[in-house]
Amino acid sequence: WIYYLKADLFLIDPAVRPLSPATGISISIASLVIGWLVYDVLCKSPLEQNQILLSIIGFTFVILMAYFYQNMFSPRGAFIHTGALMATIMSANVFLVIIPNQTKVIASLKAGNAPDPRLGAIGKTRSTHNNYLTLPVLFLMISNHYPMTYSSPYAYILVGFVLIAGAMIRVFFNFRHAGKGDH
């Protein structure tokens, strides 16, 4: 909320784009909602059958949004908004997809019916996305304490490296926790 309450200080940089606080806040909120909707549509499209392609398109989408934010807000505001976009996607996955699907599965089982396996598959996809976004979101949220992370004109490219590094770290921990890695 501090980015909205003090938008002229934290969110907006007239050297990047001369926006009023109200305009900056509106763009911020709209981009988070639209970002979720774009992601949700991608996940419900035929791409859901090709997880690798869906991941590549999702990765590209986040980089494009980071570039958009970098050309719209202050450098600090851009990085925090890229993290906020991914955190919004993660939260919406839980509250709008994973929990409702689980509720339907439980209701089916309680009624003595076989649950729709597609609901579980959808939940697993969204949960997997959340798993791989967790570390990049944490990095982007704490990066505001380290100006060297967001002050470059190529900061949006750093977002890509953070996404890749976060995914690689999660793969390592996923294998290790599954007992498939060295202990």
Write out the residue ranges for each language-model feature:
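Polytopic transmembrane helical bundles with strong interfacial aromatic enrichment
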Residues: 1-183
